[in-house]
Amino acid sequence: MNWKYIFIIISFSLKAQAEKENNYISKGNGLHENKSYVDAEAEFRKALSINQDNPIANQNLGNTLYRSEDYDQANQRFFRSQKDNLDKSQKHLAFHNMGNVFMKKKDYPKAVEAYKNALRNNPKDDETRYNYALAKEMLEKEKKEDKNK
């Protein structure tokens, strides 16, 4: 009989934690949309303090950090998001965003790889296909410039 009560208490506790986590993510999303990136970051970090493996919170925190031009931290969050996520559409998003970070940093070999991984998870995304082609073009241009030096 005691096990039954313990199970019920644990179930309610876990449900409350999940709701709290989702509330932080939801609030962070609203703040991000309003371009309140510092406040959005705080909300996503609160969600991650409850569950550090939440791929949505990691992805959204990465987006917020990207908008704040903190590309290294953003990339870490995108990497974590794709690592913790089994959903192909979310993996696609994470790899696509990692490619965007690498493009900003002019790290074209890594951008090409990231976009390639994004396309493996969603081969129909035209934007990713375009970015992949652009990254390959920039990589070739960089190689030619290095050769001419």
Enumerate the language-model features and the residues they cover:
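Feature detects intrinsically disordered, low-complexity acidic/polar segments
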Residues: L65-K149
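Alpha-helical segment of the N-proximal tetratricopeptide repeat
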Residues: E19-E43
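Hydrophobic h-region of N-terminal signal peptides that target proteins for export
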Residues: F7-A16
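Positively charged n-region of N-terminal signal peptides that target proteins for export
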Residues: M1-Y5, D107
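Absolute protein N-terminus
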Residues: M1-N2, A16-E19
